[in-house]
A protein has these predicted regions:
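Bacterial N-terminal signal peptides that target proteins for export
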Residues: 1-10
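N-terminal entry module detector
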Residues: 2, 19-22
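Hydrophobic h-region of N-terminal signal peptides that target proteins for export
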Residues: 10-20
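Primary mode marks residue(s) on the alpha4-beta5-alpha5 output face of response regulator receiver
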Residues: 23-194
Length: 194
């Protein structure tokens, strides 16, 4: 009996991974519902949603303004959706372009983007810009929830430092902290338990 339970448990864990690895995009309505899930409810209806067409290419699934949400990549091994202020789109879009061109190192992507911000090619927001995301777990289209997903909330403040914000550069308990201080990608990290 114990072996049977373990096999069934393994099948439950492996099935979503195999399905995701097949690379078939979810139906448009499901992609939209999952993509906007990290947002506060009052932002969901107006957000622009980028998702995947039948050809597997990123496309606009729904026009909107204020926030941009990315649906789950059907080729990714785990569930991840994110939404960010549209003022961050030049920076985010450039990251997607670099990954699509074969650059896979996060450090290399940031090196290119930081150089382009410095040269004026990428314009960063003048005011703080939020990002909301959900990672792991999986989206349940029947309930419209993502059981087991972890929330992440950040606020981008380009070039902010510990001195300019009064925030530590190291995480401590449930306190906010600043990550990548002094760079174009400087942002305040918030824990979901706050």
């Amino acid at each position: 009996m114990r072996i049977r339970e373990l096999l069934i448990g393994a099948l439950v864990v492996v099935t979503p991974i195999v399905t995701a690895a097949q690379g078939t995009p979810a139906p448009k309505a499901e992609q939209i519902a999952a993509a906007v899930l990290p947002l506060p409810p009052d932002f969901r209806a107006s957000a622009r949603v980028l998702g995947y067409g039948a050809d597997g290419k990123l496309t606009t699934l729904r026009e909107g303004k204020g926030m941009i949400c990315l649906a789950r990549d059907p080729k990714a091994p785990r569930f991840h959706v994110a939404c960010y202020a549209e003022s961050m789109e030049p920076f985010m879009a450039r990251g997607r372009e670099l990954r699509a061109s074969g650059v896979t190192s996060a450090a290399e992507i940031d090196t290119v983007r930081f150089r382009e911000v410095k040269s004026g090619k990428i314009i960063m927001p003048k005011f703080p810009a939020a990002l909301y995301s959900l990672t792991d777990g999986d989206f349940d289209p029947k309930t419209g929830t993502a059981p087991g997903a972890r929330h992440l909330y950040v606020v981008y403040i380009p070039y902010a430092t510990a001195e300019s914000t009064g925030l530590s550069t190291k995480p401590f308990g449930n306190q906010p902290w600043i990550m990548l201080p002094g760079t174009p990608k400087a942002h305040i990290m918030f824990t979901s338990s706050m």
